[in-house]
Amino acid sequence: MLTVADLLDLNDTIAADLFAGKTYPWEALEEIGDYIRRLGPTLPPEEFDHPAEDVWIAKDAKVFPSAYIGGPCIIDHEAEIRHCAFIRGSAIVGKKAVVGNSVELKNVVLFDYVQTPHYNYVGDSILGSHAHMGAGSITSNVKSDKTLVVIREGTEQVPTGRKKVGAILGNYVLNPGTVIGPHSNVYPTSSVRGTIPPHHIYKNEHTILPKK
């Protein structure tokens, strides 16, 4: 359940080629910035503005004046970047995605229709299409002891080789290296670690139920 094919629909992102040849989604994290620098100059100028170095913004995206957008960054069609959003760089924001008030992004891919609407931090993470983060949700991306992040699925442990891995397709409060399968839900106030299968409901660490 940890592979790109298991977790992500590459038809729902401008960054599909970023994941080519990769087994696990987090393998793309170290390449996001360079990928943007390659892709940006190829985007049609009649559709994308180029307001700053390594920044490309679709002409039909809505960007509030108080938002900060640092490069490298691509903001795709009809995305909305709201008041005081802080994009630190190496960020791809998908079609019709929402980056809300005081949300901070760093080294991320938001697939199409992702919503990070209220006071979220998303770092070193990949959020699949239609993923929604509740108000105040964060993706912790560094372990307290600074050791390399390991993804856990049951008894299996998959080393990432990285000190910084946030969440893959995640929402709510997530610990480093959290993976949540498509169409799963997490109860508010949860602290999630490890892997949640597709089509499940996470109530707490002892209660993970299949959707009916």
Predicted features and spans:
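Short gly/ser/thr-rich secondary-structure transition/capping motifs
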Residues: 43-48, 60, 116, 155-158
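Glycine-rich active-site/cofactor-binding loop and its immediate structural neighborhood
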Residues: 57-102
